[in-house]
Amino acid sequence: MRALYAAAMLTLCSLLLPGPAAAQTVELKLGHVGSPGSLFDLSATEFAKRVKEKTGGKVVIQVYGASQLGDDTELLQKVKLGTVDLALPSTVMSSVVPAFGLFEMPYLVKDREHMKRIDKEIVWPTLVPIAEKAGYRVLATWENGFRQITNNLRPIKGPDDLKGIKLRVPKGKWRVKMFQSYGASPSAMGLSEVFVALQTGVMDGEENPLTQIYTSKFQEVQKYLSLTDHVYTPAYVVASPRKFDGLPEAVRKQIQQAAQETQPFVYETGAKMDEDLLGKLERGGMKVNQADKQAFQKASKPVYDNFSTEVPNGKQMIEKAIALGSGK
């Protein structure tokens, strides 16, 4: 505890004292799992640029992508321990804060405008305080995106086509339950392991936003791309209280402002990538088909029912999120 207090005071003094000490910079490590050129990569780079500008160079964000600092689960553990300062988790948040499983509900989020309303009315007043109690400082909501299914066996037109398919999913229990209810054989796996699993046939397929599919080069080892849009996954800028809380209040505010002001860039870039990458994946040899979304929605009822009963206030959160989709 004394060592932690001393480190915090040293950081504080380096930012506030005049002279040479003031010239020192604070470096914060941000880890994420996205490949170069992914939405995660572009978003984190934009955020780092904004932090440097806002703090006049006093704070520098060092970005480590492609799981260099660990997979999603490891990054959250390291953030809590203070060995990584910032992370960009998505689905995995539901494994440490069950209420974040709200965003594992199929077809809950209609579009980015709907997500903005959910962010304002549910994420900040309800989910963020729970995350804080669990030891995570949520600075902003960004995006992973609308998820699609790829595989090597057949086009996925409806839930029945998933029966028996070995499908990689991220580490979140509701995604596993969802695909089990569709008849697939899902296995949770870190993103950095997926390419080899697909290449060797350990997994038949996976599901991800187009940005992750393309930049992870899954088109090189997958034949079919089925446009299901089954889940929209946000991403969260999460800070370690051990480091973040030791910074001066003004600096903390600047960092959080930079994170939140990056959100429009994230949404605009994500939308553009969705448009651009579909054609690139098709030209790369993938066979693309539209899925029967109504059939998937009908098959998703058990997941909603389970979340409503297992997670405190789960039913109320679902109802509120759905109502926000109609502009209420």
Per-range role (PLM):
Residues 1, 23-24:
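Absolute protein N-terminus
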Residues 1-9:
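Bacterial N-terminal signal peptides that target proteins for export
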Residues 10-11, 21:
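Cleavable N-terminal signal peptides
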Residues 17-23:
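Sec/Tat signal peptide C-region and signal peptidase I cleavage site
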Residues 24-114, 120-328:
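N-terminal secretory/targeting leader peptides
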